[in-house]
């Protein structure tokens, strides 16, 4: 069973806070990567670098045609942190009027992460609960 992390962006200090979900109330901040610190797309996660995974790196299954692993992309609303939901299902429900079913991938890449970094994301999802998988990481363009 993969550990779940509570990831929260602190715009005042420009850091991403990673905390164990449900076991600890605080954790050490990890700086977001600079543009020049891109990691190799084929690098796999080891136990040592799992704790400081940069915001810009996501598992390769995140952008697969069949969608990401359920444990990787789960989220919870601030008021109901105990009940996580699958992000793909949540996003599909919000995008019912979109003409194509596969538009969630570019939306996540281009808009969601940008909104999160700018602090203008939907306040109900300002904290994400992410689980881990062992897929290789990729660098977002």
From Swiss-Prot:
UniProt keyword terms in alphabetical order: Activation of host NF-kappa-B by virus, Activator, Apoptosis, Host cytoplasm, Host G2/M cell cycle arrest by virus, Host mitochondrion, Host nucleus, Host-virus interaction, Modulation of host cell cycle by virus, Transcription, Transcription regulation
InterPro entries reported for this sequence: Transactivation_prot_X
Gene field: X
Signal sequence range: none
UniProt keyword annotation of Ligase present: no
Residues covered by region (Mitochondrial targeting sequence): 68-113
Similarity remark: Belongs to the orthohepadnavirus protein X family.
Segments for region (Disordered): 24-51
Record protein name field: Protein X
Role summary: Multifunctional protein that plays a role in silencing host antiviral defenses and promoting viral transcription. Does not seem to be essential for HBV infection. May be directly involved in development of cirrhosis and liver cancer (hepatocellular carcinoma). Most of cytosolic activities involve modulation of cytosolic calcium. The effect on apoptosis is controversial depending on the cell types in which the studies have been conducted. May induce apoptosis by localizing in mitochondria and causing loss of mitochondrial membrane potential.
Pfam families per UniProt: X
GO CC field: host cell mitochondrion; host cell nucleus
Record text on subunit structure and interactions: May form homodimer. May interact with host CEBPA, CFLAR, CREB1, DDB1, E4F1, HBXIP, HSPD1/HSP60, NFKBIA, POLR2E and SMAD4. Interacts with host SMC5-SMC6 complex and induces its degradation. Interacts with host TRPC4AP; leading to prevent ubiquitination of TRPC4AP. Interacts with host PLSCR1; this interaction promotes ubiquitination and degradation of HBx and impairs HBx-mediated cell proliferation.
Keyword Transcription appears in the UniProt entry: yes
Predominant cellular place of this UniProt entry's protein: host cell
One GO BP: symbiont-mediated arrest of host cell cycle during G2/M transition
